[in-house]
């Protein structure tokens, strides 16, 4: 299995933002355990909701929270949706255990993640597929089931090689697992968890790929299927930039996230203007559900760049 990240291009300004944030976060280590625990609880909820919603789960974020915290069912919602939410949250916890125990990547780990994700939903949970499949809407057909084990051997071997750049390696990890499609079902959910497993093993926070970006997500996966991994790499990099920003907002006052409405009141710019610049990627910002947030530090950096331009 060939892996060459020289063809994977990510905007240098975006990479610089991520590297600077990662450096600032690393300079704060060791991070307070209580704060990390709360952060990971939030990521666990949001990852579970969004990863399931991408696959068609009908639970809202608040309903997902209720199911996970109270263990009860939501009237009018399919039982399958409740099982998916509980399974994904449990798989996220298992992923954290693998990170804490410093377990190396292996086929067994990936199969265990799949077993948890599809528990009670798939009779072959945790087992590679024993037949050929087609993916609706995909431009390519997954390889023959007879090649899955050898392809997964190559996949694990490539992951274990030192990454030239974690973001580019994560792009390969995510796409290749979707491409091999080793299981009859649940491949997307497993790929998103395995990507986060890799990131956290490299000292990065987990990322959340959002359901409102579902069309973009499938489009960049389609482009990756056709040999262009750069759009997927940028998509993942933007998610990482946001995750790092969320982490820093907890530990540094100047990085504390506030809504653009509040930020506009502290600046000469309108909320509409700041929102536009956030969408354009000019103002470092994070979108949590339907609301944009940024920080005083990001605003100061934006103003500084504007003066220099």
Regions found by a protein language model. Give the residues of each.
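FIC/Doc superfamily catalytic core
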Residues: 1-185, 189-309
